[in-house]
Regions:
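Short amphipathic alpha-helical segments
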Residues: 107-108, 116, 400-403, 452-453
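Extracellular/periplasmic envelope-modification machinery, especially enzymes
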Residues: 189, 295, 307-437, 448, ...
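Residues at alpha-helix caps and immediate loop-helix transition turns in enzyme cores, especially N-
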Residues: 220, 251, 451-454, 481-485, ...
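Cell-envelope and extracellular/periplasmic
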Residues: 440-445
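A short helix->loop->beta-strand "cap" motif at the edges of active sites that frequently abuts
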Residues: 464-467
Length: 552
């Protein structure tokens, strides 16, 4: 928002007009070739991971190329923090919002330029327009946070998440690139170097703090978080712009220039590379390999391939590059990658193994629940449930084993279930006076941040005469967080006789063979993972039955 608006203001200052066609042409050559290169390069790597990551990959590619990923994710009910099978091109949702901004804002600024305003009045008109659009967009996000249950709309929607661009546009009218304001020039003269650096570093620190204290599904994130993050980012931009004019004799470090040039490419490549490599190796090694390959391919794209497509001479940091001997190889490689991408897209399943398994398990769970309901209605005393298992997708994955080993247990499991979602099911049973004597809480992977208060609400609402079994969560990618949840649950079991722990975390650690080729949360179905999971819970239930219930 800042850079595009500042450049448009500079163009109007020079020409007293805006060339809309040239604007869109520049945006096309900057945005489209890199995203095509990213898709072509990353597609062969998908052959290294399980087919869950290429399920419906063709639709994801079409959404990315059409700059509609944000709406695609909204319509399929996706979650940005889906940690099981994240879409490889999910990150292009923000690029989609950016392109929507370019189209709308470019046309609006062009229309304003047709009013034949003076440069000062033109800047003022942009300020008023961007201010109105900023508050309108922020208001949409603010109000929607009270109305929508699925935060994906607020997060992905162009209407609610484009307001930061307009805040950047506001700051562009207050400073600029070539044509700057008198107020900005005075600030550069009056502000000390220390003050400028303090504003930059302080804003950056506050931005980091927001990243630690706010969560994706937290209401405060949408009420104030994104607005504050945008403000701190703009303060950093303003400080960096002032620093540039404050130190005119100091050249920008070459390293900074290099990464500035290829930052868009790194943004495009890093996500699919990390998702793929994190399935194959440790987190630190996946991060290192992601950084190296993202940097290499982003540099190749920016300095070599993009200039070739635009008909320009390739240059790297001002040094001319002779790539004529390599053109045939580059074109040939692109053709081969395109064929590979098409084959993978057409051969990809609509549903991956994990999604298919979840669908089958959900149907099995529904059928089992119906049978138990019918048996209770018929008055079969032996079918009375004394155990309710409220679980997430790991419990859902174990549905068949639960049915065979614990046929009288009622399973209520769903994908991506958090503590809050589990509490709704728990409280419904409490209010209806249908809560079984033993409640098994098998969640935690999807909401590890506020686990103390989340778990405490179950203890507070558990009626007298009941027992609670806590299943420790396990996620190989978030071992530190999972360990903290486990330690807390073990402490609760020591402090409360009616609380028992089913230590799935420790069982998972003791059986590394069940995790081969998985996401580190859902055991491989080709192993005895389901037996281990159910047995861990069954043993804990047996142990709980020998302990006092709440209030006894």
């Amino acid at each position: 928002g800042f850079l595009i608006t500042a450049l448009l203001i500079d163009e109007y200052h020079r020409k007293q007009s805006i060339d809309l066609l040239s604007f869109f042409k520049r945006r096309f050559y900057r945005i489209v070739p890199p995203i095509v290169i990213m898709v072509l390069v990353t597609m062969p790597f998908t052959l290294l991971v399980r087919n869950d990551f290429i399920a419906s990959i063709g639709r994801q590619i079409v959404a990315a190329f059409g700059f509609m990923t944000n709406w695609y994710e909204i319509f399929i009910g996706s979650n940005y923090e889906n940690q099981f099978n994240p879409h490889l091109f999910l990150h292009t949702w923000s690029l989609a919002v950016e392109v929507h901004f370019y189209i709308f804002w470019g046309i609006l600024v062009w229309w304003l330029s047709r009013r034949k305003l003076t440069s000062v009045n033109f800047r003022g008109a942009i300020f008023l327009a961007s201010t109105a659009l900023f508050f309108s967009g922020y208001l949409v996000m603010f109000i929607s946070s009270f109305l929508v249950k699925n935060v994906s709309f607020n997060y992905f929607s162009t209407f609610s998440h484009s307001f930061p661009f307009y805040l950047g546009a506001i700051y562009a009218t207050m400073s600029g690139v070539a044509d700057t304001t008198k107020r900005f020039k005075k600030n550069v003269q009056r502000w000390s170097l220390r003050r400028i650096l303090f504003q930059f570093v302080g804003s950056f620190a506050l931005l980091l703090l927001l990243g630690f204290v706010l969560s994706y599904d937290g209401q405060l994130t949408y009420l104030f978080g994104f607005a504050l993050a945008s403000l701190f980012a703009c303060l950093m931009i303003y400080a960096a712009r002032a620093l540039h004019d404050k130190l005119p004799a100091v050249d920008e470090p070459v390293v900074v220039t290099f990464f500035s040039d290829i930052s868009y490419g790194i943004y495009l490549f890093h996500w699919p590379f990390y998702i793929i490599f994190s399935q194959l190796m440790s987190n630190w090694l996946a991060s290192l390999l992601t950084f190296v390959l993202s940097t290499a391919f982003a540099a190749l794209s920016f300095y070599v391939i993009e200039p070739m497509i635009a008909g320009k001479e390739p240059k790297m940091l001002g040094i001319k590059l002779n790539v004529t001997p390599c053109k045939k190889w580059i074109i040939g490689s692109a053709g081969i990658l395109a064929v590979i991408s098409l084959i993978i897209s057409f051969a990809a399943p609509k549903l991956g193994e994990f999604e298919s398994g979840v669908l089958v398990d959900s149907l099995t769970q529904a059928d089992t629940g119906m049978n138990l309901t019918n048996q209770r209605t018929a008055g079969d005393a032996n079918a009375q449930n004394n155990v309710l298992i409220i679980g997430d997708s790991v419990a859902l994955r174990s549905q068949d084993t639960f049915s065979s080993k614990m046929p009288n247990a009622l399973i209520d499991a769903s994908v991506s279930r958090s503590f809050d979602a589990a509490y709704e099911t728990f409280k419904t049973n409490v209010d209806a006076n249908t809560l079984p004597e033993t409640v098994v809480l098998a969640v935690g992977v999807n909401s590890p941040d506020n686990y103390q208060s989340d778990i405490q609400q179950f203890l507070d609402a558990l009626p007298d005469g009941h027992r609670l079994v806590l299943v420790t969560p396990y996620d190989a990618q978030e071992d530190t967080k999972m360990s903290a949840v486990r330690d807390y649950e073990l402490q609760l079991a020591q402090d409360n006789d009616y609380v028992t722990v089913a230590d799935w975390y420790q069982t998972a650690k003791d059986n590394p063979d069940i995790w081969g080729g998985t996401d580190g949360v859902h055991y491989s179905q080709s192993t005895n993972g389901a037996d281990l999971y159910v047995q861990t819970i069954q043993d804990a239930i047996s142990q709980a039955s020998k302990k006092s219930a709440k209030g006894q």
